[in-house]
């Protein structure tokens, strides 16, 4: 089964080897037909402390690192993935 990959913005890098990433999703409301924005914060493992606040990054599902951390930062961040595409 493939691992899910999400794109978001780093909102906190104060913890050691951990970043908090805000991921926004958009959907059309079934009755109002209006685009609705919802966001969720994910704690992700950042082994080398490379991500900085405000940076756009990709996170990938992984094994549990702790009670809250079940995602990891994709190596290289958004710049590396964008250049490959």
Curated annotation (Swiss-Prot):
<comment type="subunit">
    <text>Part of the 30S ribosomal subunit.</text>
</comment>
<keyword id="KW-0689">Ribosomal protein</keyword>
<comment type="function">
    <text>One of the primary rRNA binding proteins, it binds specifically to the 5'-end of 16S ribosomal RNA.</text>
</comment>
<keyword id="KW-0694">RNA-binding</keyword>
<dbReference type="GO" id="GO:0003735">
    <property type="term" value="F:structural constituent of ribosome"/>
</dbReference>
<dbReference type="InterPro" id="IPR000266">
    <property type="entry name" value="Ribosomal_uS17"/>
</dbReference>
<dbReference type="Pfam" id="PF00366">
    <property type="entry name" value="Ribosomal_S17"/>
</dbReference>
<comment type="similarity">
    <text>Belongs to the universal ribosomal protein uS17 family.</text>
</comment>
<protein>
    <recommendedName>
        <fullName>Small ribosomal subunit protein uS17</fullName>
    </recommendedName>
</protein>
<dbReference type="GO" id="GO:0006412">
    <property type="term" value="P:translation"/>
</dbReference>
<dbReference type="InterPro" id="IPR019984">
    <property type="entry name" value="Ribosomal_uS17_bact/chlr"/>
</dbReference>
<keyword id="KW-0687">Ribonucleoprotein</keyword>
<dbReference type="InterPro" id="IPR012340">
    <property type="entry name" value="NA-bd_OB-fold"/>
</dbReference>
<dbReference type="GO" id="GO:0019843">
    <property type="term" value="F:rRNA binding"/>
</dbReference>
<keyword id="KW-0699">rRNA-binding</keyword>
<dbReference type="GO" id="GO:0022627">
    <property type="term" value="C:cytosolic small ribosomal subunit"/>
</dbReference>
């Amino acid at each position: 089964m493939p691992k899910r990959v999400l794109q978001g913005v780093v909102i906190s890098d104060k913890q050691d080897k951990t970043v908090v990433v805000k991921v926004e999703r958009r959907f059309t409301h079934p009755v109002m037909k209006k685009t609705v924005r919802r966001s969720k914060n994910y704690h992700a493992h950042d082994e080398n402390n490379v991500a900085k606040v405000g940076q756009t990054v990709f996170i990938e599902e992984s094994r549990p690192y702790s009670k809250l951390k079940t995602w990891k930062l994709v190596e290289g961040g958004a710049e590396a993935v964008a250049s490959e595409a």
